[in-house]
């Protein structure tokens, strides 16, 4: 039994932030009904290549992007722009606990699928809206995309090498981190609202903004500015407040050292056979190492050119100083620790019984995550869900009219 068994989610979202939230809820046992456009589906279904191979190794038209964020969901293809399609959504909403949507602010009101409309049908509903900029403010009605928000929020100003270094300049993060974080925060907010409902008997509205989330997630960098009045700058792979905490080039390739305290730095110097560094008062305390970073780092950089990355990692790891390699994704998924933790899971797909995906990191002792089904084909569950309140004949008529899509019988 999943932790959220018995919770029904009407998922009107698409692309990443909303679907990421929905997938987490589904992994935890909620019934997540994903509404998609007939014959088209979620935009990310076409965000390929790469495409998922079928059982024989032939490429399907199921994108890797869609597969990463839609497992354990039920796909129902309904045209919500029509009155008949809206009526179908109302029927689902009547018994839903949660609604997730990420349309532009105000867009769903014209279809009477906004919070005001659905909460009249079901006052217990928890309704989560995810937008780029929130429901109010001067930019509320604008669409928001992860890349744009990474720039606006200040994240890109602290990501990448300084301008005066080769290859320097603002960089986005390698995954859509704002969307993913917003999905996580939305999941937390939804679960909080469900707990509140158990006390008050009422649902509520949740207003989530990508920009809000990423500004909140500036964490120490945002606080550093508020504390000092100085805007943090791009430092490549270095840390603004801890030294040494960065990548270093060995004889063959780069590796990472992350000394979080003075004892770890002392142990590092012992591990790499460089005790002379400890005789210099400039390097004993972290606050001084930060101040004299430009003296310490060149010394370490020169020293690390003497051996391979593996040799250094093994030596440093032996004294329990945080150290690591820089893996490709291929190497990361083959990492023994990742394999042991079962992060790559097999879920039979209708097109490929050997379908693999990256699983949930959540490990619950009593109500573990379960993988009931792979990401669905478009409209795969239309008949299964809508037959709860429509006959096969009625569904066939709706399909003929283009209101719904998917196999009916």
Task: Label each residue range with its predicted role.
Residues 39, 133-134, 210-215, 252, ...:
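Glycine-rich beta-alpha junction loops
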Residues 135, 165-176, 198-214, 233-240, ...:
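Conserved Rossmann-fold dehydrogenase catalytic segment
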Residues 284, 352-401:
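Flexible, small-/acidic-enriched active-site or ligand-binding loops
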Residues 318-372:
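A glycine-rich dinucleotide-binding beta-alpha-beta segment and adjacent secondary-structure elements
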């Amino acid at each position: 039994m999943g932790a959220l068994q018995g919770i029904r989610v009407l998922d009107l979202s698409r692309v990443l932030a909303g679907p990421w939230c929905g997938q987490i809820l589904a992994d935890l046992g909620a019934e997540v009904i994903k509404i998609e456009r007939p014959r088209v589906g979620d935009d990310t279904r076409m965000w390929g290549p790469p495409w998922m191979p079928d059982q024989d190794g032939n490429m399907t038209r199921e994108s890797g992007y869609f597969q990463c964020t839609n497992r354990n969901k039920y796909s129902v293809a309904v045209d919500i722009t029509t009155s008949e399609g809206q009526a179908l959504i109302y029927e689902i909403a009547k018994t839903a606990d949660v609604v997730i949507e990420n349309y532009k602010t105000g867009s769903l009101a014209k279809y009477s699928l906004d919070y005001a409309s659905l909460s009249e049908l079901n006052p217990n509903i928890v309704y989560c809206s995810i937008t780029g900029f929130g429901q109010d403010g001067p930019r509320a009605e604008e669409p928001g995309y992860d890349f744009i928000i990474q720039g606006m929020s200040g994240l890109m100003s602290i990501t990448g090498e300084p301008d005066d270094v080769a290859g320097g300049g603002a960089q986005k993060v390698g995954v859509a981190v704002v969307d993913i974080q917003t999905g996580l925060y939305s999941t937390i907010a939804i679960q909080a609202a469900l707990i509140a409902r158990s006390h008050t008997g009422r649902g509520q509205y949740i207003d989530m903004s990508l920009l809000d989330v990423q500004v909140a997630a500036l964490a120490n960098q945002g606080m550093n500015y508020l504390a000092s009045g100085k805007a943090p700058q791009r430092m490549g792979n270095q840390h603004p407040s801890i030294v040494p905490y960065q990548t270093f080039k060995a004889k063959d390739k780069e590796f990472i050292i992350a000394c979080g305290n003075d004892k770890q730095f002392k142990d590092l110097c012992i591990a790499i056979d460089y005790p002379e560094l400890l005789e210099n008062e400039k390097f004993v305390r972290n606050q001084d190492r930060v101040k004299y970073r430009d003296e310490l780092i060149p010394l370490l950089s020169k020293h690390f050119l003497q051996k391979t990355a593996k040799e250094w990692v093994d030596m440093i790891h032996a004294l329990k100083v945080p150290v690591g390699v820089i893996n490709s994704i291929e190497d990361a998924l083959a990492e023994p620790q990742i394999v042991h933790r079962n992060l790559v899971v097999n879920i039979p797909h209708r097109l490929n019984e050997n379908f693999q995906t990256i699983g949930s990191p959540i490990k619950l002792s009593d109500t573990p995550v379960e993988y009931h089904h792979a990401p669905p084909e478009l409209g795969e569950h239309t008949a299964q869900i809508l037959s709860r309140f429509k006959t096969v004949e009625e569904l066939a008529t709706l399909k003929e009219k283009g209101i719904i899509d998917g196999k009916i019988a």
